[in-house]
Amino acid sequence: MQNQLNTLLQSAKKSVADAQSEIVLEEIRVDYLGKKGKLTELLKSVGQMPADQRPLLGKAVNEIKREIQQLLNAKSTQLREKSLQEKLNKEKVDITLRGRYDHLGAIHPISRVSERVSQLFSMLGFQIAEGPEIENEYYNFEALNIPADHPARTMADTFYFSGDKLLRTHTSPVQIREMEKQGVPIRLIALGRVYRRDLDQTHTPMFHQVEGLVIDKRSTFANLKGLLQQFLNCFFEKDVRLRFRPSYFPFTEPSAEVDIYQPRTDKWLEVLGCGMVHPNVLRNLNIDPDEYSGFAFGIGLDRLAMLRYEVTDLRLFFENDLRFLGQF
């Protein structure tokens, strides 16, 4: 019996040592320690031995059973560690490789400028108004004292739909609509996209504009100049030099264009138009021009962005080149 036990133990040791997977190891356990296993069969035969030998043989069988179980446990741990190491080696990261970076989005420079302009005018007591981009001729032209024979109303300058529908050429129609709803006095700005048939280094068919309007009983051109100077100083965070040049707009009288001085190039760049609201515009809204007066101004947000970020070509803002937009 003892020889059988020793032979069985050596056979189990070899089988466990040769096992290369948990599945094979489980088969070995069943083969030796299962209900019908080799060691279990030997344990059953102990009862047939002489009574004085049974305790010693039973003890020997249990010791071999315990040793085989320890061999199985040790081999199982070894196989799990080996499997884990192989998995880690497959998933190993080469830290010498160049990393993969996610491209983070950013706020478009025009949107940045638009938000900044809105905040500054809100601080100056202006309300923010919006209106439709598809307008009719009355709000875009007639209510603003632009007659039918005015050059701005030709198809060479304006995008027309059928009938009297068109893409608005400025945000002034928003001011007319708000005065119809609110009456006067009023103090507001209107921001948004506007459309004109123009394309060069400083013009695009679609651009962004903010127009301001103040109607009160004692509004003067001096108020207008002071407001624009204060706004532009705040926007550029420094004192800027402005030049007011006499100009003509159908909806303001007197009118002026405003240039801002660029020290870097020693040149002046036009940034906005302004003037006192024309009496005819007030009359169109049943407002007495002898009692009320006001001023209006229109600023190209794209021009402001060009100046703030020192961009020389306006079209760069609309070409969706991430190399350019990623700089802001």
Swiss-Prot record:
GO terms for molecular function: ATP binding; magnesium ion binding; phenylalanine-tRNA ligase activity; tRNA binding. Its cofactor is Mg(2+). One of its GO terms (biological process) is phenylalanyl-tRNA aminoacylation. Keywords: Aminoacyl-tRNA synthetase, ATP-binding, Cytoplasm, Ligase, Magnesium, Metal-binding, Nucleotide-binding, Protein biosynthesis. Binds 2 magnesium ions per tetramer. The keyword Aminoacyl-tRNA synthetase applies. GO terms for cellular component: cytoplasm. Mg(2+) binds at E253. InterPro entries: aa-tRNA-synth_II (IPR006195), aa-tRNA-synth_II/BPL/LPL (IPR045864), Phe-tRNA-synth_IIc_asu (IPR004529), Phe-tRNA_ligase_II_N (IPR004188), Phe_tRNA_ligase_alpha1_bac (IPR022911), Phenylalanyl-tRNA_Synthase (IPR002319), tRNA-bd_arm (IPR010978). PROSITE patterns: AA_TRNA_LIGASE_II. Its main location: cytoplasm. Pfam families: Phe_tRNA-synt_N, tRNA-synt_2d. The keyword Thylakoid does not apply. It is found in: Cytoplasm. Belongs to the class-II aminoacyl-tRNA synthetase family. Phe-tRNA synthetase alpha subunit type 1 subfamily. Tetramer of two alpha and two beta subunits. This is Phenylalanine--tRNA ligase alpha subunit. The lineage of its organism: Bacteria, Pseudomonadati, Pseudomonadota, Gammaproteobacteria, Legionellales. The gene is pheS.
